[in-house]
Amino acid sequence: MIDRDDLSKMPFHPSRRQMISGMASAAVLLGGGRAFGQARVQIDQGNVAPLPIAIPNFVAGSPSDSEVGAGVAKVITNNLKRSGLFAPIDQAAYIEKITNIDVPPQFANWKTINAQALVTGRMTRQGDGRLKAEFRLWDVATGQQLAGQQYFTSPEYWRRIAHIISDQIYERLTGEKGYFDSRVVFVDESGAAQHRIKRLALMDQDGANVRYLTRGADLVITPRFSPSTQEITYMEFGQGDPRVYLFNIETGQREIVGNFPGMSFSPRFAPDGQRIIMSLQQGGNSNLFVMDLRSKSTTRLTDTPAIDTSPSYSPDGGRICFESDRGGRPQIYVMGATGGAAQRISFGEGSYSTPVWSPRGDYIAFTKQGGGQFSIGIIKPDGSGERILTSGFHNEGPTFAPNGRVLMFFRDPGGNSGPSLYTIDVSGRNELKVPTPGFASDPAWSPLLS
């Protein structure tokens, strides 16, 4: 079933493919060796002291580009600060004004304000209307250029360039991939608690560029990205039984994923993007099924007198974690991707739900309920190393950043208020609220866009 009513008429941003075509086919390395200098964030060594970093406004090729140059620097600053690993220095403390990025900075001026790393950049309008963005990353102590690249893009995508540069800086100084050039799909909530309108919404990971994918006529929950980031699967309560839908972000078209009798819910893509795993209700039980999106064939993975739901694949697609009450209370189980025997991995007090596998493969995040608290935690796939990251009245729905270092979840204080999105590091530090236009729940973080 293809549904083109209204959705295809909505304004959509260009796809990732179209956005990248506006840039150079390959980023050009402007300098910098592979060796790390003294400016380095030791991300795996316990409590991390944030690295002092200076990020002046990017030099403008013309007066009309000065606002964009300042905007790029601000986005990079906010990204790095929110990661908890960097301490951007206030521009009011700067001694030197960068006017030409082709000339090495006066490093003594940056040492004086205790900067360990320095980012310089330039935004230049090209004859064809495109923007040329350049940046350099410097180790202040050694004077070594650590990275330098240039990009070409349409002017409206300057924020995207800022996220890509943020990822380059993050990776160069931590040794791990960044997560800033990514998006989040979530459920936007508005109206009184008794008559809440819920719409699918999409935004950059920092809360910018929000746009709505559905109009709120029907209740929607549990949106999830495809590996390509161009499709979303979600559950909608429309006429009749709730159904799982597949939504194309680029075209605005959607279709039902299988016309099954009864209720289908908790959908999630396989890592290959060719299959969707979900839970189907049959009588009083719910079992896991996987559907091939091309052939529409389905395979049953579990067959128990219980409720099996919330499945999530391991990054290599070889295993599945899911929630099941087959032992009484809801717990987390792990089994092979083709079904078979399942191993329970959660044994703490209370019940466990909404498991999701980290893109790194090292942890499974979950919601834990017990003692009047809803907690967000992580556990290793073998059941060891359980750790609670944050607790409160109602925390739920964890989702990993593309690099597996940060989690996003939603918190609902109850009453006349509504839910909000938060991020927290897998270490349990740096809990931050994510800005959204209104109430927000059920977040899902995309893979990196580039």
Curated annotation (Swiss-Prot):
Gene3D superfamilies: TolB, C-terminal domain, TolB, N-terminal domain. The keyword Nucleotide-binding does not apply. Keywords: Cell cycle, Cell division, Periplasm, Signal. One of its GO terms (biological process) is cell division. It is found in: Periplasm. GO terms for cellular component: periplasmic space. Belongs to the TolB family. NCBIfam families: propeller_TolB. HAMAP family: TolB. Part of the Tol-Pal system, which plays a role in outer membrane invagination during cell division and is important for maintaining outer membrane integrity. PANTHER family: PROTEIN TOLB, PROTEIN TOLB HOMOLOG. This is Tol-Pal system protein TolB. It comes from Nitrobacter hamburgensis (strain DSM 10229 / NCIMB 13809 / X14).
